[in-house]
């Protein structure tokens, strides 16, 4: 049975839950919906069958980085399951590809290989900081300091403000917030630590 999360989105597996964490962290994503459509297709010997993809993902139209990204109709599968049962899934996926193409979307299968990476761990860590509010003057001070330093790491950035650990700890959530908001850049494909290289992000 599907499980309901706090925001009402449903998921049937922990892998779907992990994908939803990535989508919530993706600033190009507008909304996503679980089990969005039921697709009819002909199975063996012309028998009418139905298939319900796991998710549909809509991208934002108000920012340049997302404007040209297509809507994605998606299925979530473990790679081993996909390999072992591909013959069973193939007619369903073919129907979904056709359904998506007719609407100008794309159909995509997400596997654990693509989902469960260091990026996921970073996304899950940073998500609680994404929409938190901090004083504008504090945010501006951190941004201006990292612009001065050009490239640094969280440890060095905090040390440039305070020598004592208490004040550094008080400021650290602001750094995580700015990384989550992509105001500060870093390589999120690698584990995020206090020694990770960080820099100011600029957008056109």
Residues covered by each model-derived region:
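Electrostatic, structured charged patches in enzyme active sites and in nucleic-acid/phosphate-binding
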Residues: 1-204
């Amino acid at each position: 049975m599907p499980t309901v999360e706090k925001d009402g989105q449903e998921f049937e597996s922990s892998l779907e839950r992990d994908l939803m964490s990535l989508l919530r962290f993706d600033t190009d994503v507008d909304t996503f919906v679980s089990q969005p459509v039921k697709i009819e297709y002909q199975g063996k010997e012309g028998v009418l069958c139905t298939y319900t993809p796991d998710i549909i993902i809509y991208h934002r139209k108000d920012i340049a980085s997302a404007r040209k990204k297509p809507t994605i109709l998606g299925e979530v599968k473990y790679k081993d399951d996909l390999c072992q049962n591909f013959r069973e899934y193939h007619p369903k996926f073919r129907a979904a590809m056709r359904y998506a193409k007719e609407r100008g979307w794309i159909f995509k299968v997400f596997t654990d290989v693509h989902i469960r990476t260091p990026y996921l761990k970073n996304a899950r860590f940073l998500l609680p900081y994404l929409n938190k509010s901090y004083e504008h003057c504090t945010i501006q001070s951190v941004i201006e300091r990292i612009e001065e330093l050009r490239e640094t790491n969280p440890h060095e950035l905090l040390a440039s403000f305070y020598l004592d650990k208490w004040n550094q700890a008080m400021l650290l959530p602001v750094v995580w917030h700015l990384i989550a908001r992509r105001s500060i850049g870093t390589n999120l494909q690698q584990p995020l630590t206090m020694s990770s290289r960080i820099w100011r992000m600029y957008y056109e």
